[in-house]
């Protein structure tokens, strides 16, 4: 009865981390939604101002109506709209035609509008750095050249074999050298034979001297 109780206990512990993972995913998804809704405030403002046909510029009230029509929560993001307008004016994207601060009327600067269109070719210029990525395949070619060099090295290997051939001839010469000492040994005993009679002659001289006495 104790064994099944032990096996049943770890099961709920395994399920709990899975729930934590699901809970962790939810705030991440919410943060992604907030990010998607947050940053484009300035973009929405520029689009609304560009869409307006008023020569004197778009007022804040008209801008809010345009944003609300696009599904943007104007009441909650009122401060963001004002900050977005100020930042766009400071950048030169919008020109304030009437009033001061965020309470005036705003118009899209023609120079800024043309400047916004120009960054698109800059993106094409940003695509130029991709060429170095195309240059990277050249490295494998160098590696292929290295492989060719490796293939050439085995051709050099036969040369040491040719050098090994004289080594085969060298063992013959020590054999000749081995024969020559044998001859020298044969000569030495011959030279020793004449040495033997010399002491005999010396003994003969000594005996002759004794006889003279």
UniProtKB/Swiss-Prot annotation:
The modification Citrulline is found at residue 55. Residues 1-41, 92-213 are annotated as: Disordered. GO terms for biological process: nucleosome assembly. The modification N-acetylserine is found at residue 1. Residues 37-110 form the H15 domain. The modification Phosphoserine is found at residue 105. Belongs to the histone H1/H5 family. The modification N6-acetyllysine is found at residue 15. Residues 120-131, 138-170, 179-213 have a biased composition (Basic residues). Keywords: Acetylation, Chromosome, Citrullination, DNA-binding, Hydroxylation, Nucleus, Phosphoprotein. Histones H1 are necessary for the condensation of nucleosome chains into higher-order structures. This is Histone H1.3. H1 histones are progressively phosphorylated during the cell cycle, becoming maximally phosphorylated during late G2 phase and M phase, and being dephosphorylated sharply thereafter.
